[in-house]
């Protein structure tokens, strides 16, 4: 009886009381555990290794220098060589582009900030003049004078954005820091209107505009600023495309022909030259008769002396 009573009591207590680990009010265990967010791995570009590409190019060239290489295998290796060289060229260009972007990023940022500030100021000045109560003739004259300055400011702004990324950046506002002292010294003089001061500051800091400034202006008219930024234009003042489709095909074909001719000439040179073993054997054959002739002369001279000695010995014993 006591055992049965204890079992019933234990079962009753288990049914009425809850576990200590389950949902106590005011405790931290009452909240379910939060699941950790699993972030997907970032997609990393697997760019080819430059050293690996160079090694493959050396191996293929070494294989093409063999004289006994079959024709079909030679064609396959020449195509592989052209592909490896193209991959190497693209990878080097990509690395150069990335390096130039990192190098001139801050300078371009400062120039873009200054150019956008000046452009906004000139546009604000133009709006003020157009909304002012001036004579139509005077208003037209001022707007015409301000239009050239706005155009120069727009070219400056596009210059800082669409300058070719793969070329050395020439700053427009490089002389601004040098002229801070001069401007502070001349600040006591009566100042001109804000727009005129800003436009003169742009012209002074620009100085002799770099050649790319005219290219940017031409590309603004043609609508090819994106191509200029990516380096797909030749960078001349005309702004024409440097890599057109037919010219690319012709140049590529000519380079392939030159490469094939170079490989063919190198193989012919290798075939004309004797191998290492033949050169060594030929050298030995050429040197061997010279050595034998010298030794024969020494041998015969030694034999003559020996004959004289024998004759003298014979005469001595005879005596």
UniProtKB/Swiss-Prot annotation:
Coiled coil region boundaries: 49-131
Bias class Basic and acidic residues marks the residues at 1-13, 230-275
Spell out the GO cellular component terms annotated for this protein, sorted alphabetically and separated by semicolons. nucleolus
Is the keyword Transcription in the record?
no
Keywords of the record, alphabetical order, are: Coiled coil, Nucleus, rRNA processing
**Can you tell me which family this protein belongs to?**
Belongs to the EFG1 family.
* PANTHER family in the record: RRNA-PROCESSING PROTEIN EFG1 (PTHR33911:SF1)
| Name of the protein this chain belongs to | rRNA-processing protein efg1
Organism, by scientific name, is: Aspergillus fumigatus (strain ATCC MYA-4609 / CBS 101355 / FGSC A1100 / Af293) (Neosartorya fumigata)
Q: What is the lineage of its organism?
A: Eukaryota, Fungi, Dikarya, Ascomycota, Pezizomycotina
